[in-house]
């Protein structure tokens, strides 16, 4: 059996740019890509916390240390500067590997300050 698992997640990053006329993609600070284990040109899903939109694109690298999150091309219609996003990548693996797998998660606050890194999403409690 093959399972699709969360590989990496950038939790609550803030959109710094939205460029409708740029060639597709989402530009992400290289430090952020590394924090979540996301590769340049990798498929990503984006969940907009502010408006509820969910869309897919691919990651490209933005300047290291810039804190840039730029939603480009048609996807720019799905996010505005200042919106909070959750950016995820997924990986497929065997059932046995999936049971041992832990995603790379980066938690952000303010103007895209990496607050902490984790190897799991916390258990939700009542």
Curated annotation (Swiss-Prot):
Cofactors required: pyruvate
GO cellular component: a single term: cytosol
Compartments, record wording: Cytoplasm
Annotated binding of substrate, by residue: 57, 73-75
Cofactor comment: Binds 1 pyruvoyl group covalently per subunit.
Annotated active site: 25 (schiff-base intermediate with substrate), 58 (proton donor)
Residues with Pyruvic acid (Ser) modification: 25
Catalytic activity: L-aspartate + H(+) = beta-alanine + CO2
Short name of one Pfam family: Asp_decarbox
EC numbers, comma separated: 4.1.1.11
One annotated GO biological process: alanine biosynthetic process
Pathways involved: Cofactor biosynthesis; (R)-pantothenate biosynthesis; beta-alanine from L-aspartate: step 1/1
Record's keyword terms, sorted: Autocatalytic cleavage, Cytoplasm, Decarboxylase, Lyase, Pantothenate biosynthesis, Pyruvate, Schiff base, Zymogen
Location, primary (coarse class): cytoplasm
Enzyme class name: lyase
Annotated family: Belongs to the PanD family.
Described purpose of this protein according to its UniProt entry: Catalyzes the pyruvoyl-dependent decarboxylation of aspartate to produce beta-alanine.
Subunit comment: Heterooctamer of four alpha and four beta subunits.
Record-linked HAMAP family: PanD
The name this protein goes by in its record: Aspartate 1-decarboxylase
Species per Swiss-Prot/TrEMBL record: Serratia proteamaculans (strain 568)
Taxonomic placement: Bacteria, Pseudomonadati, Pseudomonadota, Gammaproteobacteria, Enterobacterales
